[in-house]
């Protein structure tokens, strides 16, 4: 073992945080927080879902991603409450999640959540491997942010085109290449113990991506211009070069990468900021903690503590105490847009640094700050509510999230309540006065995102204190009627009956499109046969039709003279993607021969209960590819 590697092992040996766990025992079930936060990433999955998928309201989606450029770019995570796969925040989220395992692997293991966590991270790293189609080519985004944000519906039935955008040596993107290199390098470390070949593969791609990022420099939004309104890299790319270099050093023990990181530090503005924190855009605050531990250099230690002091008790500058804004309720508040994600990020940095620093007063200071802020998010706040969906007291019920909401009409007001529980995400959070409204339309305060939960997940691991995870979690959601018919009587007399029927696809477990839906209308022709006529004499005609074919009457029970007409929408795509897209109407008439006064609908199975008002009826059963999916059939 080299001296340098021995030093590295001494610095980064996994340690039980017994002091933290025993000190911060509380009424909060931290492992439940951790369990649900991890599950959130499963809800964000794009692509072909495995049999192990635990959410019955999520299905395959984005299966043609990359088809426009001739590559398989399926997989990865949807960014937030939308369905774009933005490369920069996805890579950041994966890197931070891997870092939480690096720091708190033992906590994940003891909580019996390590496998779940690794599974979520692997979903992202698998995608990065697909997106890295050449040493100097990486597909940095799939989906048009503008088109995506203009539609409100479940991921499984997205109707818009999803173009792919790349970076290469002709049009580079240092931020996303270096950030992805960091995610893959960190991934190679945490997977080495359980899957060494996979870890080696991740490391190979990490090296290539970092070399690409370093050699061909440029801001990625100059090439992936579609990302600019959503994830512009305001901090530039130097911070990602530092961050990526550190993780490659940790993964390889190659001094070259540490030297590259330290060289990039010299390109960082000399007046190192201390009034912000880590984010998808700024990875300097993460990097300086790792550099403090690796190098023990005074500049990194002082900069880290200056930042953590600013967030906690205050930093003395020129005889004046500088401190972040605190809400009346005690939240360290940086910015309105996703206020809690910044606080969660700062808390994670405090946990990590407190676990390393030897000064007991500083250790206590940073731990106290981190745990208080975490508890604020879990319920210790003036609103007396949890800010984690599906957890605690009075949690958010209306997060800004398309698939969880489950609209069928391309409207965030329909339905009035979410159809699905999106367990685990941290919502944006309150304003500087602790005020918050649980409003689906408020994407500033009530959206969720993969980057919001990354460090927050680590906080759950940092404070885990021996509780047990929830058994049989998540519960399987009860499926509502997904396909059904509403019908009304337009006219009815002794010569004919005219019915208005609307076939609906409001599927959500999961949402899905169908081009093979049909329904049947059953009649009893006893009175027709009694008059010497047969089913062949009954006319079935469409008065108004949105694409269906009507069958002649077909025998169902000859002995009872029960027949049906099948209204078949085969070839017509019906899916929960808009007001006119999720339903199809037909008006049809059943008529006695030659206008004879022998028609009597009162004994018809499907006529029972119908009025002049539209209503759902189980007596008009619905079929998909010939299989009954709604309603009941007449007894034979």
UniProtKB/Swiss-Prot annotation:
One of its GO terms (biological process) is cellulose catabolic process. Residues 478-635 form the CBM3 domain. Its EC number is 3.2.1.4. One of its GO terms (cellular component) is extracellular region. It is an enzyme of class 3 (hydrolase). SUPFAM superfamilies: Carbohydrate-binding domain, Six-hairpin glycosidases. GO terms for molecular function: cellulase activity; cellulose binding. Residues 1-25 form the signal peptide. Gene3D superfamilies: 1.50.10.10, Endoglucanase-like. InterPro entries: 6-hairpin_glycosidase_sf, 6hp_glycosidase-like_sf, CBM2/CBM3_carb-bd_dom_sf, CBM3, CBM3_sf, Glyco_hydro_9, Glyco_hydro_9_Asp/Glu_AS, Glyco_hydro_9_His_AS. This is Endoglucanase 4.
């Amino acid at each position: 073992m080299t001296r340098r590697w021995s030093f590295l092992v001494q610095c980064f040996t996994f340690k039980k945080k017994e002091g933290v766990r025993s000190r911060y025992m509380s009424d909060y079930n931290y492992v439940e927080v951790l369990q649900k936060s991890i599950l959130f990433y499963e809800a964000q999955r794009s692509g072909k879902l495995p049999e192990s998928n635990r959410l019955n309201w999520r299905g395959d989606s984005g299966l043609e991603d990359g088809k426009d450029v001739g590559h398989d770019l399926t997989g990865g995570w949807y960014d937030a409450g939308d369905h774009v796969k933005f490369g920069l925040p996805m890579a950041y989220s994966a890197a931070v999640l891997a870092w939480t395992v690096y720091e708190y692997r033992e906590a994940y293991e003891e909580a019996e959540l390590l496998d779940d966590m690794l599974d979520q991270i692997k979903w992202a790293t698998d995608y990065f491997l697909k997106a890295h189609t050449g040493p100097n080519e990486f597909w940095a985004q799939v989906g048009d942010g503008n088109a995506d944000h203009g539609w409100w519906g479940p991921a499984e039935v997205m109707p818009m085109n999803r173009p792919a955008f790349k970076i290469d040596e002709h049009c580079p993107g240092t931020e996303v290449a270096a950030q992805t290199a960091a995610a893959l390098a960190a991934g190679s470390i945490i997977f080495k113990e359980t899957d060494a070949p996979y870890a080696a593969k991740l490391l190979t791609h990490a090296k290539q991506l970092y070399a690409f990022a370093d050699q061909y420099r440029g801001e990625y939004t100059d090439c992936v211009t579609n990302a600019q309104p959503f994830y512009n890299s305001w901090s530039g790319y130097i911070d990602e070069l530092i961050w990526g270099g550190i993780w490659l050093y940790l993964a390889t023990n190659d001094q070259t990468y540490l030297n590259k990181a330290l060289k990039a530090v010299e390109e960082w503005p000399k007046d190192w900021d201390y009034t912000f924190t880590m984010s998808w855009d700024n990875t300097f605050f993460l990097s300086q903690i790792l550099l403090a531990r690796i190098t023990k250099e005074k500049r990194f230690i002082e900069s880290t503590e200056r930042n953590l002091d600013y967030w906690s008790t205050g930093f003395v500058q020129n005889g004046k105490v500088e401190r972040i804004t605190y809400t009346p309720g005690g939240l360290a508040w940086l910015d309105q847009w996703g206020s809690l994600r910044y606080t969660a990020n700062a808390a994670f940095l405090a946990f990590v640094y407190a676990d390393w620093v030897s000064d007991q007063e500083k250790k206590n200071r940073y731990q106290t700050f981190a745990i208080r802020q975490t508890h604020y998010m879990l319920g210790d706040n003036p609103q007396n509510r949890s800010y984690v969906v599906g957890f605690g007291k009075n949690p958010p019920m209306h997060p800004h999230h398309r698939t969880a909401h489950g609209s069928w009409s391309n409207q965030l007001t329909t339905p009035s309540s979410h159809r699905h529980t999106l367990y685990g995400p941290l919502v944006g959070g309150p304003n500087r006065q602790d005020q918050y409204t649980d409003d689906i339309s408020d994407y500033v305060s009530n959206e969720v995102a993969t980057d919001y939960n990354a460090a927050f997940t680590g906080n759950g691991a940092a404070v885990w204190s021996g509780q047990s995870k929830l058994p049989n979690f998540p519960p399987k959601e009860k499926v509502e009627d997904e396909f059904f018919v509403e019908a009304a009587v337009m006219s009815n007399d002794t010569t004919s009956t005219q019915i208005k029927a609307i076939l609906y696809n409001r599927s959500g477990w999961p949402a899905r499109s169908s081009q093979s839906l049909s329904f049947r209308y059953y009649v009893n022709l006893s009175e027709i046969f009694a008059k010497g006529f047969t089913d062949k004499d009954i006319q079935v005609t469409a008065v108004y039709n949105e694409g269906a074919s009507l069958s002649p009457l077909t025998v169902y029970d000859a002995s009872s003279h029960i027949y049906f007409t099948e209204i078949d929408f085969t070839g017509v795509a019906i899916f929960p993607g808009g007001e006119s897209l999720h339903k199809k109407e037909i008006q049809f008439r059943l008529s006695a021969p030659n206008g004879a006064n022998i028609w009597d609908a009162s004994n018809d199975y499907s006529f029972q209960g119908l009025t002049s008002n539209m209503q759902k009826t189980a007596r008009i059963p619905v079929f998909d590819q010939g299989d009954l999916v709604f309603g009941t059939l007449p007894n034979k």
